Amino acid sequence: FSYLIAGSLLYRDQRTMSELASAAIGQSTLLAKGATEDQAMAFLQPIVIDTHALNNPWLNYSVYLCNTLFPGILMLLIYLVTAYTIGVEVKENTAKELMHMADNSIVTALVGKLLPQTIIFFIIAVFYNVYLYGFLHYPCNSGIFPMLLAGLLLVLASQAVGIFFFGLFGTLRLALSAASLWGVLSFSISGFTYPVMAMHPTLQALCVLFPLRHYFLLYANLALNGYPLIYAWHSVVALLIFMLLPFFVLKRLRTIMLHYIYIP
């Protein structure tokens, strides 16, 4: 399915047109030489091929595009909003007040700040899933509930990456820049427009570092192919691993919130 990009579909249509034009010339030549129409068709096309595309028989490019583009945009927004939500506390000099309200617990502070956003982002994920599979009737052979679970995992993994970026760089501007870069690269390297197996081996190894890649694999295995969730366990585990990233920067985050001073 990842090969069925717009260029491939256009090439297929143009090739079909050229073959039909060539066949029309050959048919006219055979008819002029006295062959019957049946004899001409049997000579031009002795074997008739009847092909049916699996899981997307309409070859609707939107089916391949929107099911990853929508969550990709949501993921990018989550990166930016999460990093900004934490960084703005330092920028506005309210980080110490937040930590005081959380009894100097960075975990409590992060949960209090980000949990409402998690709920809102998950509602957005539910909305686009219902819109794609319930309203537009895009193929969803596994049922909508596994895709809702995949959406929740993507939301949590994206928030974890946003926290990690701010904890890693320690400044709002660098965290937002890194989040923007990582989010934009996700669209190219996730595999829904260009197959990962055709990429350079280095990029094939790096693609696992992007949450959108694992969400795309979940979509392909669950919604398109209709496999049970157990057969996509590796993608689920990968998204769960992304959720562990904040634990590597918790100590640094606490130091930032308590002691860092924002420099314009």
Segments and roles (model prediction):
Residues 1-81:
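Transport-system extracytoplasmic interface segments
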Residues 2, 109-110, 166, 216:
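Short, surface-exposed helix/turn micro-motifs that flank interaction/cofactor sites
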Residues 12, 80-88, 92, 159-167, ...:
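Short helix-terminus and kink motifs of transmembrane alpha helices
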Residues 18-25, 29-37, 84-91, 109, ...:
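Low-complexity, flexible helical/coil segments
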Residues 26-29, 78, 94, 126, ...:
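Short amphipathic alpha-helical interaction/hinge segments
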Residues 41, 50, 54-58, 98-111, ...:
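Juxtamembrane loop-helix boundary motifs flanking transmembrane segments in multi-pass membrane proteins
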Residues 52-132:
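Hydrophobic alpha-helical transmembrane segments of multi-pass membrane transport proteins
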Residues 119, 123, 127-131, 139-264:
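Membrane-spanning alpha-helical segments of multipass transporters and channels
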